[in-house]
Curated annotation (Swiss-Prot):
It comes from Dictyostelium discoideum (Social amoeba). Part of a complex, TORC1, consisting of tor, raptor and lst8. Part of a complex, TORC2, consisting of tor, lst8, piaA and ripA. Additional proteins, such as 14-3-3 and heat-shock proteins, may also belong to the TORC2 complex. Keywords: Chemotaxis, Cytoplasm, Repeat, WD repeat. This is Protein LST8 homolog. PROSITE patterns: WD_REPEATS_1, WD_REPEATS_2, WD_REPEATS_REGION.
Length: 304
């Protein structure tokens, strides 16, 4: 089993697996007409989820069999978010059909269905594994309590400006939302009540839509990827910019941190993925092979 799994997906309808040090592609999955929006690798590195339109497909990582191991049907529109419960018991998805769903991985089927009032752009799981937080095109953020099976909180930080991405710190203490106007909103979550959002900061981060925002695993950094072709790295103590990563020639769609928070992988409409050394602020490797925009990246370099 490879120690580091790095994968990208593109508008060319392929998923590619890369050897991070050499930059070589060692496997490519042709998904036909299946458009992929998001990628997520399971914690145990056995499967990769490809969220598309309107299915989510699971592929085995350590095989040359490019047929899906499982397919999850039930959404009626683009699946825009996907992730896994820590122990791999279930998967969650969000879709432009206005729903957030939970799926049983052992007996594929929709376990729960949460109705939002607008197309869902992003959904994340709290580290306590007991809440999902979704963001939609109408500008609403909702907290879904998986124990009570209800929406425990709804907030609208910037009117009807669409929420594009959400991220929660690994300690569960902070949540950040980004939107189509290039703003980020930072809240502290209540220790005993995760439906309590204490506003900390509003950041005018970019002059163009933010497409992805992500905390580093050590929670010291925040990355924002934008349609302005840049990625900005923010210190999470004061939320000031510590680096601007320049190099991509078009929109930067997605990013993923290494487990030690020292590296960042990005994907862009310029058809390329890049590996950035965050100590130097430079791209140390470029992954070239897609023939259209790279809109999703996934990295799992957790110790075995």
């Amino acid at each position: 089993m490879p120690g580091i799994i790095l994968a990208t997906a593109s508008y060319d309808h392929t998923i590619k697996f890369w050897d991070p040090p050499s930059g070589g592609c060692y496997r490519s999955i042709d998904c036909g007409e299946f458009h992929i929006n998001r990628l997520e690798i399971t914690h145990d590195k056995l499967y990769i989820a490809a969220a598309g339109n309107p299915q989510t497909r699971l592929f085995e990582v350590n095989t040359n069999n490019n047929s899906p191991a499982m397919s999850f049907d039930g959404h009626k529109g683009n699946v825009t978010g996907v992730g896994f419960q820590k122990e791999g018991k279930w998967m969650y998805t969000g879709s432009e059909d206005g729903t957030v769903k939970i799926w049983d991985l052992k007996a594929p089927g929709c376990q729960r269905d949460y109705e939002c009032s607008a197309p869902v752009n992003t959904v994340v799981l709290h580290p306590n594994q007991a809440e999902l937080i979704s963001g939609d095109q109408n500008g609403s953020i909702r907290v879904w309590d998986l124990i009570s099976n209800t929406c425990s909180r709804e907030l609208v930080p910037d009117g009807e400006v669409g929420i594009t991405s959400l991220t929660i710190s690994s300690d569960g203490g902070l949540v950040v939302a980004s939107n189509t106007k290039g703003k980020c909103f930072v809240w502290r979550l209540g220790e005993d009540d995760t439906s309590r959002f204490e506003p900390l900061q509003k950041i005018e981060a970019h002059n163009a839509p933010i497409l992805k925002t992500l905390f580093s695993p050590d929670t010291k950094l925040l990355a924002t990827c934008s349609a302005d072709h840049t990625v900005k790295i923010w210190n999470t103590k004061k939320f000031n910019v510590v680096q601007t990563l320049n190099g991509h020639q078009r929109w930067v769609w997605d990013c993923a941190f290494s487990n030690d928070s020292a590296y960042l992988v990005t994907g862009s409409s310029d058809h390329l993925s890049r590996l950035w050394d965050l100590h130097q602020g430079d791209a140390v490797k470029t992954y070239s092979g897609h023939i259209k925009a790279v809109n999703a990246v996934a990295l799992n370099d957790l110790p075995r």
